[in-house]
Amino acid sequence: MTESPKRIVVGLSGGVDSAVAALRLVRAGHEVIGLFMKNWEDDDTLTQCSAEDDIAAAVAVAEHLGIPIRRVNFAAHYRREVFEHALQELRAGRTPNPDILCNRHVKFDRFLRHAREQFEADAVATGHYARTGRAGDGEPALLRGIDPSKDQSYFLAGVPRQALDAVRFPLGDSTKETVRAEARSAALPNFDRPDSTGICFIGERDFTQFMQRYIDPHPGPILTEDGREIGRHCGLAFYTLGQRRGLGIGGDRNRDSSAPWYVAGKDARRNALFVVQGHDHPWLQSAAVSTEPFHWLAPVPAEGARLHAQVRYRQEPQAGQLSHAEGGRVVFRFDEPQRAATPGQHLVLYDREQCLGGGVIDTAHPADRSAPPALQTQSTEVV
């Protein structure tokens, strides 16, 4: 069904996706206003894609489409509601997902309120590859984008459910190739601009070097599974479960295997980083995960519900069983052990194409009971 014309504020980032989202809304007859959100104050000249370049691209798109464009600075909100939380998580030895927090607190809270208050907008739109629909209770539902390689519903699992009625995702029914072709056909001035990569406030910069501006290095031992020290780390905050690159350790002359090393866990008491050899080492496998209070975007499923889950973006959905715990927490037991399920990241649940919501992983329960109980990133608690 074609939607009647509405006043829609589009978040124009300067990228191709948001540009095509605006293009489609204009062609559908809506009154479209572009809004460029500045969410990070540049503090150096190292970024390959500076805010000035992004603004220039967004303005060029708006002029090409004949729509007005405004700017808003949410940097203070972003720092308080996203970045400071990320720092707190990193200092605790966990691995946060700032993009999920940004969508929850900035893009689909601050942005939506700003659009309503300043422009009396009926809705906001972004270039996310996701869709909306109706759940069984008649309330709004978040659905996967049809392109599995670009589906971004994982990053939207923390969005306030009540906001979904006022959100439009014009690209949800498209593939990236279709969007690129449409941008080229419409002669959008940024049709060949590369996709952005990296964490939103870091961009293409080295993660460890950037974060050392805010978190003091705290060196400690790198230990093997049998407790031998084979190197030194610069601080537990700068490593994540399953990480291979940047460890500064090569082969071990005292072992038969030349397999690469991976981070398997952290012992905060000893300030020790544990590593193992082999991509699929048993210490990297989790039988289940527990979360902090879960954020539901749908009616709460029954105890024992069979669902699918992701513990990272672009992961193949994994089957398992849901259990409810005290305080709105959940436990999800996987049918097959999952590699590098990481505290601080999000468990996102799905019922077929519907995203049911997400929760921050606080414990990954190892499939291998021989993993040391002291490791901060995993628990040997029976689930």
UniProtKB/Swiss-Prot annotation:
SUPFAM superfamilies found in the cross-reference section: Adenine nucleotide alpha hydrolases-like (SSF52402)
Record keywords: ATP-binding, Cytoplasm, Disulfide bond, Nucleotide-binding, RNA-binding, Transferase, tRNA processing, tRNA-binding
Coiled-coil residue windows: none
Biological processes annotated in GO: tRNA wobble position uridine thiolation
Predominant place of localization: cytoplasm
Disulfide bonds: 102-200
Residues bound to ATP: 11-18, 37, 127
This enzyme's EC code(s): 2.8.1.13
Class of this enzyme: transferase
Region (Interaction with target base in tRNA): 97-99
Domain of life: Bacteria
Active site (record annotation): 102, 200
Stated family: Belongs to the MnmA/TRMU family.
HAMAP family associated with the record: tRNA_thiouridyl_MnmA
Name the record gives this protein: tRNA-specific 2-thiouridylase MnmA
Protein source organism: Halorhodospira halophila (strain DSM 244 / SL1)
